[in-house]
Amino acid sequence: MAEKFRVGITRDILDSRGEPAFGPAALSILADAPGLEWEYLPAVVRELTPEHAARYDAVYVNMARTPATAVARADCRLRVVARHGVGYDSVDVPAMTRAGIVVTNTPMAMPRPVATIALTFILALAGKLALKDRLTRTGRWDERMDNMGMGLTGRTLGVVGAGRIGKELLRMARVFDLKLIAADPYVNAVELSYIGARKVDLDTLMRESDFVVTIPLFNDETRHLISTAQFALMKPTAFFINVSRGPVVDERALIAALQAGRIAGAALDVFEQEPVDPANPLLAMDNVIVTPHALCWTDECFHNMASTGLKSIVDAASGRRPEFVVNADVLTHPRVLSWLAR
């Protein structure tokens, strides 16, 4: 009898009741697959180990890191690392490719949810939502006249990174009659013009925008893409929003810009250090909105991510190429060809 294809799911995707945060429906994708068995990892882990790679053919990973050391041993049976999300900076992709391990992600599940949270931040900053909530709760009703918001009509939204998520945000923002600009060296001007946006360089975007939203893919090229020089270009009335990855922004430079009043405020769903240090100065600023890298986490978003991610595992178990392969070069690796050719 053939050995079953074994799948491990990291426990950091469970809620406080021990139930999958993406709901039960997506698990049927695994339960209904012939020749496959699955389990949650025995404990919450910050990174996968050689023992995990020796036990499982595929691992569905939320936040745990997948380093090169995890797949360095000769007894590694791991074939697939499936990320619950679009980002894969937590996975040593070159090491996985060398080891003949397919890395997948869930890009199509993310554009609308992440674009929605960026738009949520824009509206909250423009209307001074957090401040007015505090005024109401602390009996400062009479201070309303001193806290006017910013109207959106004719204002400029600048999007740094015009991939799937950036384009979705630009499309959604058109209803507010904003001027739309975007900076992305890998997207052409004609493509952006189809959605009503103008392509500009990063410096121009920082100077012209009333709202700057960063949504680039995080890699070595985009680490600290936004730093002191970029914040110095912004209008003092402009707002900064980051919904990509914390290290895209030089956090010290952002703190300095806010403390000096060089920009009007910020909204962040991500931080350079996560979980964020409770002593981080950003948490004490009244003009900064913060959320715990989870604002786009909705039942719909998590179900769609899990459905896509778990299907990629079932595809691999069945000898099929998963739909969203991050490291396409691995598909010619002899180890991958051995199971794709079955």
Model-derived segments and spans:
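Short glycine-/small-residue-rich Rossmann-like dinucleotide-binding loops
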Residues: 64, 86, 216-218, 244-245
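Rossmann-fold NAD(P) dinucleotide-binding segment
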Residues: 65-78, 221-239
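N-terminal glycine-/charge-rich "phosphate-binding" loop or analogous flexible N-terminal tail
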Residues: 1-58, 333-334, 338-342
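Rossmann-like dinucleotide-binding domain for NAD(H)/NADP(H)
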Residues: 237-239, 243-342
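Rossmann-like dinucleotide/phosphate-binding beta-alpha-beta segment
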Residues: 144-236
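Short beta->alpha connector loops at strand-helix junctions that form conserved
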Residues: 84-85, 101-112, 184, 203, ...
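Phosphate-binding beta-alpha-beta segment of Rossmann-like dinucleotide-binding domains, i.e.
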Residues: 99, 107-156, 171, 175, ...
